[in-house]
């Protein structure tokens, strides 16, 4: 399965949606 993960930080001005496979650590996916 693949999940869409939204990273939101109003203070940092970040609003990113990433695709994350269920066998990948979210921190590893966020680095890519």
Curated annotation (Swiss-Prot):
Its keywords, alphabetically, are: 2Fe-2S, Chloroplast, Electron transport, Iron, Iron-sulfur, Metal-binding, Plastid, Transport
Is Hydrolase set as a keyword in this record?
no
Leader sequence segment: none
Report domain 2Fe-2S ferredoxin-type positions. Answer: 3-32
Cofactor(s) needed by this chain: [2Fe-2S] cluster
Extract one GO molecular function annotation from the record.
2 iron, 2 sulfur cluster binding
Source species, domain of life: Eukaryota
Q: What is this protein called?
A: Ferredoxin
